[in-house]
Regions:
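Local sequence-structure signature of Cys/Sec-based thiol-disulfide redox active-site neighborhoods
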Residues: 1-28
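Conserved residues at beta->alpha junctions
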Residues: 6-9, 37-38, 69
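Non-catalytic, surface beta->alpha helical segment in thiol-disulfide oxidoreductase systems
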Residues: 59-84
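Short polar/charged helix/loop
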Residues: 27-29, 45-46
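Structural micro-motif
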Residues: 50-59
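Well-formed, non-transmembrane alpha-helical positions, independent of function
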Residues: 46-49, 77
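Short alpha-helical
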Residues: 13-14, 41-42, 73
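Thiol-based oxidoreductase modules, predominantly thioredoxin-like and allied folds used
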Residues: 31-43
């Protein structure tokens, strides 16, 4: 199961769209999801660790995957189960 962390800022105008997208995708794909405010100590630490300089930023399985709001197609591709 994928682990998705969405870094956001309360003042970010695009962040609600990214939040909505990942909440909708949880219906189709099973993944752990967490939203982290970059103005908090936890958010600042994650942003520093992944060199995030803009939000929204999406970390999937510990890897910075998207900066900005991804297209639905790109997000689905990143979340789709990989064949084993």
């Amino acid at each position: 199961m994928a682990n998705v962390v969405l870094l956001y800022s309360p003042s970010c105008s695009a962040c609600p769209s990214a939040k909505r997208l990942f909440k909708e995708l949880r219906v189709k794909y099973s993944f752990n999801y967490r939203e982290v405010d970059i103005t908090t100590p936890d958010g600042q630490e994650l942003a520093d660790r992944h060199s995030v300089r803009a939000v929204p930023a999406t970390i999937i399985n510990g890897r910075l995957t998207f900066i900005g709001v991804p297209s639905r197609q790109s997000a689905e591709k990143a979340l789709a189960p990989r064949p084993t």
